[in-house]
Every structure is written in structure tokens, then in C-alpha cells.
Design a protein with these regions (language model features):
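Sensory/regulatory domains in signal-transduction proteins
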Residues: 2, 6-125
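Short, low-complexity, intrinsically disordered N-terminal peptides in bacterial proteins
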Residues: 1-2, 144
Length: 146
């Protein structure tokens, strides 16, 4: 069950959702819960790059680390801030692993156990560093590698 708090879309622990992508991150399949939270119609999501839901406040460095691991064949778990098609934000705890010819990402509600608050704080600091680098002309991808 989803609710709205400020600009954030909240959902319940029972809302487990997934998507599959090809090796380049293009969405091949998604369940209805994902489509509902992402606020994009299936026709728009299937065939789109997964970064269609990427939030600008999500540190590029986190995605760099995630891609490094999954491309090396290691599963990865991370807290991820997404932006829905209606402009609202939603946080997930994503578990991503390789499957034949692509990846599967299973997402759940982040636990409110103190870790999530710490992650949000760290992400904010990292994103501030990335923005400062961007102001100095460093491309986002390059800043993420530092």
C-alpha cells in the first residue's frame, strides 16, 4: 500500500517488486508493483534504459560501484533513491544479480533501522562532493570514479 509524505512516495514491506534488464541496463520486464511505483506505463518502461527512474540526488559513485560489481558477476545490494514519472521520490533497497543475458533487480522497502538514515546522510555528502566537482568542470562519470 503506497502513501505520499511530502514529495516522497512510501510503500509497504509487502510490496516486493522487480525488473529485468539486458546487459546494457535496458528494461526487458517489470512487475506491476514496479510500474505502479515508478508511475510509467509498461509501454514506456519496456525498452527504456533503467535510468529512466534515476534521481539526480543519487550519487553517481554508488551506481559506478554497483555496475563494477554486477559486471564482475558479483551480486550487489544498495539503497537507491528513484524518481517516479510523476516527479515523486521513492527509496528502495535493491538486490541486483546477473541472469542469463542480463540482470534482475529485486527491490523492497528500506528497513528503518538506523542504517537507512546513515546511508541517506552519506549519500548527501557524496552528492555534494560530486556537485562541487561538476562546478569545476569534472564530468559526472569521472567524478564517480574518484
Amino acid at each position: 500500500m503506497e502513501t505520499i509524505q511530502g514529495n516522497e512516495r512510501l510503500f509497504g514491506a509487502e510490496d516486493v517488486f522487480f525488473s529485468t534488464t539486458d546487459l546494457k541496463g535496458v528494461i526487458r520486464n517489470a512487475n506491476q508493483t514496479f510500474l505502479t511505483l515508478a508511475r510509467h506505463p509498461r509501454e514506456e518502461m519496456i525498452g527504456a534504459p533503467h535510468n529512466i527512474i534515476r534521481h539526480d540526488d543519487m550519487p553517481a559513485g554508488v551506481f559506478k560501484l554497483m555496475w563494477d560489481d554486477i559486471q564482475a558477476g558479483r551480486p550487489v545490494c544498495a539503497y537507491v533513491l528513484n524518481r517516479a514519472g510523476d516527479g515523486r521520490d521513492y527509496w528502495v533497497f535493491a538486490t541486483v544479480t546477473a541472469i542469463e543475458d542480463g540482470y534482475v533487480s529485486v527491490r523492497t522497502k528500506p528497513l528503518d533501522d538506523g542504517t537507512f538514515a546513515a546511508v541517506r546522510e552519506v549519500y548527501g555528502r557524496v552528492r555534494a562532493i560530486e556537485r562541487e566537482a561538476a562546478e569545476q568542470g569534472v564530468p559526472r562519470r569521472e567524478a564517480a570514479e574518484q
